[in-house]
Amino acid sequence: MLMVIDIGNTNVVVGLFAGHELRARWRLATARDRMPDEWWVQLNVLSQSAGFSLGEVVGIAISSVVPSLTATFQELAQRYLLVEPLIVNGAQDYGLPVRVEHPAEVGADRICNAIAAVERYGAPVIVVDFGTGTTFDVIDADGAYIGGAIAPGITIAFEALTQRAARLYTVALQAPPRAIGRNTRESLQSGTVLGYAELVRGLIRRIRSELGHEAPAIATGGLATLIAPLVPEFSAVEADLTLYGLRSAYERMHRSLGA
């Protein structure tokens, strides 16, 4: 089996693949101070509860935006599974041309999303990943990654507002019944949720205009289910797009090495 690990600022998502099939997945809180031994114990418990043994894992692919945890999981792979993990980054060749000024600066999760999106939907295609930050990734008609946009995630944007405005308070992040709020709660939900949906719609329209194509837009990430229903420009929601991209990156790298 192949273990794929997507390390984000808020969550660590772990998946187990048997061939092309995602057999199990877990979303865990990003705990930067947790040791390799602690992660190993937790993953063992989760895998056993799902009917799997980590002894079946023969390879690991990691996407990470948290350098300290990259090292933690690399040590876990080496010590407990006796494998050298693939650490995805924008400077490596996965068969996806990366045509930006500094390829090494492109987040590994964005590379994985692009790989999986092209495999599933062809090119051109746009991927919007809703996480701690919201990223827009653009693949042109030639199948090349050409950049995108990064916006504050809806959760941290909302937290910044309520923390800095003395008379505002936290409310449930959900779409209100109308844009014109009749009270503070509805007004906050309108400005935050509906306003964020319009941010996404507007950027998708601008990106399509610059591309010169009505490229399909795919939503992914932990908060996709909140915003995607409010954005008719989306063609699909793919909750595990990054995990599938990690699997593909691993397979492509091993094919190129003749493994």
From Swiss-Prot:
Primary gene name: coaX
Q: Which residues form a coiled coil?
A: none
Q: Where is the signal peptide?
A: none
Family of this protein: Belongs to the type III pantothenate kinase family.
Main role?
A: Catalyzes the phosphorylation of pantothenate (Pan), the first step in CoA biosynthesis.
Recorded protein name is Type III pantothenate kinase
**Binding locations of ATP:** 6-13, 132
Q: Identify the NCBIfam families for this entry.
A: baf, PRK13318.1-6, PRK13321.1
Could you tell me what reaction this enzyme catalyses? (R)-pantothenate + ATP = (R)-4'-phosphopantothenate + ADP + H(+)
Where is the protein found, in the record's own terms? Answer: Cytoplasm
Q: Which cofactor does it need?
A: NH4(+); K(+)
Q: Where is the active site?
A: 109
